[in-house]
Amino acid sequence: MTEWEHVNKVWAVVEPDIPAVGLAILLRLFKEHKETKDLFPKFKEIPVQQLGNNEDLRKHGVTVLRALGNILKQKGKHSTNVKELADTHINKHKIPPKNFVLITNIAVKVLTEMYPSDMTGPMQESFSKVFTVICSDLETLYKEANFQG
């Protein structure tokens, strides 16, 4: 099995829980990297402790994980999906590319905590490798766009 196939095997288990997983990932991101919350105008002024029941944050978590799932399902042939993600984050949201590394690192932690029997050591490595490829592809697109952020 390739890294992509390993990741997709676990992703099939995660998908039914996307609302809870997405919320957990964003909350952890905001707790461990407080500066990232400032990138979200809608949540910027709300204390992290009050975001656990925030419907807008839950919906955004769903959006994030659906986009990620669509990329993962392409098994490395994701250039169109990654380009769309880069375009919105470069031109609309103005999100620096380092934040993709932060959120994917958090995702591995959260998935490991929520799905310990699926997220074995080798599976964590597979996710890390796949996320590194995705983040690298995003960074390339940012450089091509001369992103200044």
UniProtKB/Swiss-Prot annotation:
One of its GO terms (molecular function) is peroxidase activity. One of its GO terms (cellular component) is extracellular exosome. It is found in: Cytoplasm, Sarcoplasm. PROSITE patterns: GLOBIN. Nitrite binds at residue 60. It comes from the Eukaryota. One of its GO terms (biological process) is removal of superoxide radicals. Its EC number is 1.7.-.-, 1.11.1.-. It is an enzyme of class 1 (oxidoreductase). O2 binds at residue 60. CDD domains: Mb. Pfam families: Globin (PF00042). Keywords: Acetylation, Cytoplasm, Heme, Iron, Metal-binding, Muscle protein, Oxidoreductase, Oxygen transport, Transport. Heme b binds at residue 89. Residues 2-143 form the Globin domain. It catalyses: Fe(III)-heme b-[protein] + nitric oxide + H2O = Fe(II)-heme b-[protein] + nitrite + 2 H(+); H2O2 + AH2 = A + 2 H2O. Belongs to the globin family. PANTHER family: MYOGLOBIN. Monomeric. This is Myoglobin. It comes from Heterodontus portusjacksoni. The gene is mb.
